[in-house]
Amino acid sequence: MAKLGIHSNDTRDAWVNKIAQLNTLEKAAEMLKQFRMDHTTPFRNSYELDNDYLWIEAKLEEKVAVLKARAFNEVDFRHKTAFGEDAKSVLDGTVAKMNAAKDKWEAEKIHIGFRQAYKPPIMPVNYFLDGERQLGTRLMELRNLNYYDTPLEELRKQRGVRVVHLQSPH
């Protein structure tokens, strides 16, 4: 690939090679799930791919989608996750966990965890979007109407956020 800085770089080239080696749905789905756990959401384990993670995730998603279409028949494609789980059962279990959540922080972790583990193409879109609706509704109920009235500094304190300034404020 031509070296054009951020849009084409050694990191992306390395991931293109890794992704090309994936030849089974099981391997590709597991790599996508682990990649999301390691490099996406506020709960990520690493920021090393900060400029490239969305591009890499999209390439992994493409690979999983192609392998899933080859591996599954039409019924399974529309009703099972890439791991072979019944999508409705997975969704029902996640919604039950969300409904049992006692506070907004627990609910946020459930919702984000669902996205990391099951965002399409892992879960069929029809189940995933219904899950997003149900989980998001419950999360907003737990956050309550005053969530957006809470000052930013108070939200940071509640979450244990430490602000780091890379340069001095003007």
Swiss-Prot record:
Catalytic activity: methane + NADH + O2 + H(+) = methanol + NAD(+) + H2O; methane + NADPH + O2 + H(+) = methanol + NADP(+) + H2O
Domain of life: Bacteria
Enzyme's top EC category: oxidoreductase
This protein's record includes keyword Oxidoreductase: yes
GO BP term (any one): methane metabolic process
Entry EC no(s): 1.14.13.25
Keywords for the protein's UniProt record, in alphabetical order: Monooxygenase, NADP, One-carbon metabolism, Oxidoreductase
Keyword Oxidoreductase attached: yes
Classification via Pfam families: MeMO_Hyd_G
Gene3D superfamilies: Methane monooxygenase, gamma chain, domain 1, Methane monooxygenase, gamma chain, domain 2
Single GO MF annotation: methane monooxygenase [NAD(P)H] activity
InterPro entries in the cross-refs: Me_mOase_g, Me_mOase_g_dom1, Me_mOase_g_dom2, Me_mOase_sf_g, MethMoxGammaMmoZ
Record function comment: Responsible for the initial oxygenation of methane to methanol in methanotrophs. It also catalyzes the monohydroxylation of a variety of unactivated alkenes, alicyclic, aromatic and heterocyclic compounds.
Quaternary structure annotation from Swiss-Prot or TrEMBL: M.capsulatus has two forms of methane monooxygenase, a soluble and a membrane-bound type. The soluble type consists of four components (A to D): protein A, comprising three chains, in an alpha-2, beta-2, gamma-2 configuration, is a nonheme iron protein containing an unusual mu-hydroxo bridge structure at its active site and interacts with both oxygen and methane.
Protein name: Methane monooxygenase component A gamma chain
Organism per entry: Methylococcus capsulatus (strain ATCC 33009 / NCIMB 11132 / Bath)
Organism placement in taxonomy: Bacteria, Pseudomonadati, Pseudomonadota, Gammaproteobacteria, Methylococcales
